[in-house]
């Protein structure tokens, strides 16, 4: 039986070949999360970036075990804000609030 790649696998392969686009991907991931609140999609996207960077390397930089990081970013993960902040900082970014645009009716 042929095993087909998942969307995560395809995304990971793409960004491995195009690392210059990871910043836009990360920004868009958080932007979409701000709109729809879908944490499993955000965690999936962070998993992709973690695998590109290297889960063991990222876990060490964040101060977590490899298994702890994988669990936090799993589809059933419920990471604390300080974990997400540490992950984002280890990727070279920071969380920063941005004022919402007011809709004109």
Spans of model-derived segments:
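N-terminal flexible/basic segments that precede or flank functional cores
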Residues: 1-44
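The DNA-recognition helices of helix-turn-helix-type DNA-binding domains
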Residues: 76-77
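Short, charged recognition helix plus adjacent turn
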Residues: 52, 96-105
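Short alpha-helical DNA-recognition segment
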Residues: 48-70
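DNA major-groove recognition helix of helix-turn-helix/homeodomain DNA-binding modules
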Residues: 80-98
């Amino acid at each position: 039986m042929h095993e087909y790649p998942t969307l995560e696998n395809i995304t990971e392969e793409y960004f491995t070949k195009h690392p210059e686009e990871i910043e836009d991907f990360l920004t868009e991931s958080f932007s979409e999360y701000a709109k729809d609140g879908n944490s499993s999609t955000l965690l999936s996207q962070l998993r992709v970036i973690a695998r590109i960077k290297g889960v063991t390397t990222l876990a060490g930089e964040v101060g977590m075990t490899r298994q702890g990081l994988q669990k936090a970013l799993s589809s059933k993960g419920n990471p604390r804000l300080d974990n997400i902040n540490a992950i984002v900082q280890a990727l070279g970014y920071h969380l920063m609030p941005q004022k919402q645009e007011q809709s004109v009716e």
